[in-house]
Amino acid sequence: MVGLSRLAGGGLLLLLLLALLPLALDGKPAPLPQALPEALAGGTTALRRDVTEEQQQQLVAEESSGPAAGRSDPKIGDGCFGLPLDHIGSVSGLGCNRPVQNRPKQIPGGS
């Protein structure tokens, strides 16, 4: 048997709460849960709007356009990795594996 000192801590309060809980409900049973709405026959695809022919053409045009659309050469212009170089990169040649055409000649001993 559990001692009274142990029940006096938190156990007595729990027993009192459990004993008074039916009185708080006024003897009424808990309400039954409502039924969930039934799903549509087509699932989530039935919720989609119909796409018009014009919208479909726009989607196809957006998918076919982009940064690489219509290119046959991987590089464009004088840039590296298909991107144009800034002034510093074009002078120093950093990031490119080819010689720079308009590189200024360095003067030995100059600052």
Swiss-Prot record:
It holds the Pfam family ANP. GO terms for molecular function: hormone activity; toxin activity. This is Natriuretic peptide TNP-b. GO terms for cellular component: extracellular region. It comes from Oxyuranus scutellatus scutellatus (Australian taipan). Expressed by the venom gland. The lineage of its organism: Eukaryota, Metazoa, Chordata, Craniata, Vertebrata. It is found in: Secreted. Keywords: Disulfide bond, Hypotensive agent, Secreted, Signal, Toxin, Vasoactive, Vasodilator. Disulfide bonds join 80-96. One of its GO terms (biological process) is vasodilation. Snake venom natriuretic peptide that exhibits vasoactive and probable hypotensive activity. Is only weakly active on natriuretic peptide receptor-C (NPR3). The keyword Signal applies.
